[in-house]
Design a protein with these regions (language model features):
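Alpha-solenoid HEAT/Armadillo-like helical repeat scaffolds in large eukaryotic proteins
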Residues: 19-27, 50-58, 82-90, 113-121, ...
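Structural detector for internal amphipathic alpha-helices that build alpha-solenoid repeat scaffolds
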Residues: 1-13, 22, 30-44, 49-53, ...
C-alpha cells in the first residue's frame, strides 16, 4: 500500500528524480527514508539507479530501508545476491524484511536457502512465512514443507504452510495431506483436511464428532 505520510511527514512524490537523489545523500535518516519511498514509486530506470548504490551502504539502517523499498522497481529482480545476503543475515530485521520482499514481489531465490532460513527462524516468523509460495514443485521441497508444517507451533504458520502444500501438491499428494491435516490439534487445519476429503472422496466420519463445532458442521454439510 502506497504511503502518503512517513513519521509525520508527507512523502514528496512530486519531486523529480534528481531532487530526490540529492535527498538520498542527506545525513538525516528521515530525508533518506522519504526519498526512498518517493523514488520507489517512480516508473523510471533513473530512480532505480539512484537507489541501487545504497545496497552496499555502510549504514545498516539505510541498507535496510533500501531492502524494503527498492524491489518495487521491476529491475530490482536482478538484486538476488543482495536479497539472499539479507535473509542469510544474523540480524532478524534483515531476515524478516527480506522474506517479506520475496513474498510480496515473488523474487526467486535459492530454494534450499529459503527453506533453511525459514526453518532456522520459524518460531519468530509471521507473515514472512508467505515467502514459501515461491518454491519450485518437487519431491525434496515437498518433504521439507511437511517437516516445517510439523514443526510449526503457531496456527497461522501451519495454516499458511498447509495452504502452500495444498496449492502445490494436490492432487498428487492428496491422501498424504489429508492424513497430515486430519490429526492436527488446530481446528483450522482439520477444516483444511475436510476440504481435501470432500474434493477427493476421503472418509469424513472421524470429523463428525470433532470437539470443534465448525469442524463438525463442515463435515456434516453436504
Amino acid at each position: 500500500m502506497k504511503k502518503e505520510i512517513l513519521n509525520g511527514t508527507r512523502i514528496p512524490y512530486e519531486l523529480s528524480v534528481e531532487e530526490l537523489s540529492k535527498m538520498l545523500s542527506s545525513p538525516i535518516m528521515k530525508d533518506f527514508s522519504l526519498a526512498c519511498e518517493a523514488l520507489s514509486y517512480k516508473n523510471d530506470i533513473t530512480a532505480y539507479e539512484a537507489m541501487k548504490p545504497f545496497i552496499n551502504d555502510k549504514d545498516k539502517y539505510r541498507r535496510l530501508y533500501i531492502l524494503k523499498t527498492i524491489f518495487r522497481h521491476p529491475n530490482a529482480a536482478e538484486l538476488v545476491d543482495f536479497l539472499e545476503n539479507a535473509i542469510s543475515s544474523d540480524d532478524l530485521l534483515f531476515v524478516d524484511n527480506g522474506l517479506i520482499v520475496i513474498s510480496e514481489y515473488k523474487i526467486k531465490v535459492s530454494d534450499s536457502l529459503l527453506l533453511s532460513v525459514v526453518d532456522k527462524h520459524l518460531p519468530k516468523l509471521y507473515t514472512a512465512v508467505r515467502s514459501l509460495t515461491t518454491l519450485e514443485i518437487c519431491e525434496e521441497n515437498y518433504s521439507k514443507l511437511v517437516a516445517l508444517f510439523t514443526r510449526a507451533e503457531q496456527c497461522s504458520q501451519k495454516e499458511f504452510i498447509g495452504e502452500v502444500l495444498a496449492d502445490k501438491y494436490l492432487p498428487s499428494k492428496s491422501k498424504e495431506l489429508f492424513e497430515l491435516f486430519s490429526c492436527d490439534k488446530f481446528a483450522k487445519i482439520r477444516l483444511l483436511a475436510i476440504k481435501v476429503a470432500k474434493k477427493y472422496g476421503y472418509d469424513l466420519s472421524v470429523f463428525l464428532f470433532d470437539e470443534d463445532g465448525h469442524v463438525r458442521n463442515l463435515a456434516n454439510k453436504i
